[in-house]
């Protein structure tokens, strides 16, 4: 099934140059007077090699049909991440290198979709947004309002995002999983 490059998301499985690749990160860039393009970080599922590729916005991307099974993230143990099938309660574990940047959004009991190709788990698809708790940031300013000023905040998963100055430690925020950006308070 062909989709435009602009609809590519982290966690998708695509066919590129005749081989299966997992999409790890996607960045839509629009440099000055030039045409917009999509900079994607891909991992070859056969060899495990990581590389970046630049797609033009209208380029058709062949999304591979995989078995998508709804699962719930349970916990991680080092580089192993454990998921439970919500239909039959079977557990599956995936390695950190299979998950890529998606590990920065995984919290206990998060409902996700795990993709299987030929019976082997090849990646996950995250929800559009996740709610994460701020564990470290600079103190908030009194009477701070939303503006173009931001500060870095470390979230419970280790992800660092730029947040407005009124966000304090311990607050839950909503983060966009495609961009890795702050959206709002939860």
From Swiss-Prot:
The keyword Aminoacyl-tRNA synthetase does not apply. The keyword Protein biosynthesis applies. Pathway: Protein biosynthesis; polypeptide chain elongation. Keywords: Cytoplasm, Elongation factor, Protein biosynthesis. It comes from the Bacteria. Involved in peptide bond synthesis. Stimulates efficient translation and peptide-bond synthesis on native or reconstituted 70S ribosomes in vitro. Probably functions indirectly by altering the affinity of the ribosome for aminoacyl-tRNA, thus increasing their reactivity as acceptors for peptidyl transferase. NCBIfam families: efp (TIGR00038), PRK00529.1 (NF001810). Belongs to the elongation factor P family. This is Elongation factor P. The gene is efp.
């Amino acid at each position: 099934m062909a989709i435009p490059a602009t609809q590519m998301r982290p966690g998708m499985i695509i066919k590129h140059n005749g081989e299966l690749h997992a999409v790890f990160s996607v960045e839509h860039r629009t440099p000055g007077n030039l045409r917009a393009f999509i900079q994607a970080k891909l991992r070859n599922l056969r060899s495990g090699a990581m590389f970046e590729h630049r797609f033009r916005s209208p380029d058709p991307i062949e999304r591979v049909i995989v078995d998508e099974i709804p699962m719930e993230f349970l916990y991680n143990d080092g580089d192993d991440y454990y998921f439970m099938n919500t239909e039959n309660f079977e557990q599956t574990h995936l390695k950190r290198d299979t998950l890529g940047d998606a590990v920065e959004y995984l919290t206990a009991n998060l409902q996700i979709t795990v993709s299987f190709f030929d019976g082997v788990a090849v990646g996950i698809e995250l929800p559009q947004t996740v709610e994460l708790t701020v564990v470290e940031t600079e103190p908030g300013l009194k009477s701070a309002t939303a503006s173009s000023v931001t500060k870095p905040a470390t979230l419970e998963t280790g992800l660092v995002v730029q947040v407005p100055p009124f966000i304090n430690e311990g607050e839950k925020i909503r983060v966009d999983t495609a961009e890795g950006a702050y959206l709002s308070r939860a």
